[in-house]
Amino acid sequence: MAKKDVIELEGTVSEALPNAMFKVKLENGHEILCHISGKLRMNFIRILEGDKVNVELSPYDLTRGRITWRKK
């Protein structure tokens, strides 16, 4: 998938699930299932409930996403 096709949104982590999966509540009220991007995983960035994150969504499946950035 090309980088230009992704949808970038902001949200808050509402629940931490096994296997580095998270439920993220988006600003528009939807709740999606997300995994951590490779850069965050390689640099051991910890993501906890309540953290503000940037999420990338594919236009083909709007129920799953990738966490690309954790805000302070």
UniProtKB/Swiss-Prot annotation:
The lineage of its organism: Bacteria, Bacillati, Bacillota, Clostridia, Peptostreptococcales. InterPro entries: NA-bd_OB-fold (IPR012340), RNA-binding_domain_S1_IF1 (IPR006196), S1_domain (IPR003029), TIF_IF1 (IPR004368). GO terms for cellular component: cytosol. Its main location: cytoplasm. GO terms for molecular function: ribosome binding; rRNA binding; translation initiation factor activity. It comes from Clostridioides difficile (strain 630) (Peptoclostridium difficile). It is found in: Cytoplasm. SUPFAM superfamilies: Nucleic acid-binding proteins. This is Translation initiation factor IF-1. One of the essential components for the initiation of protein synthesis. Stabilizes the binding of IF-2 and IF-3 on the 30S subunit to which N-formylmethionyl-tRNA(fMet) subsequently binds. Helps modulate mRNA selection, yielding the 30S pre-initiation complex (PIC). Upon addition of the 50S ribosomal subunit IF-1, IF-2 and IF-3 are released leaving the mature 70S translation initiation complex. Keywords: Cytoplasm, Initiation factor, Protein biosynthesis, RNA-binding, rRNA-binding. Belongs to the IF-1 family. Pfam families: eIF-1a.
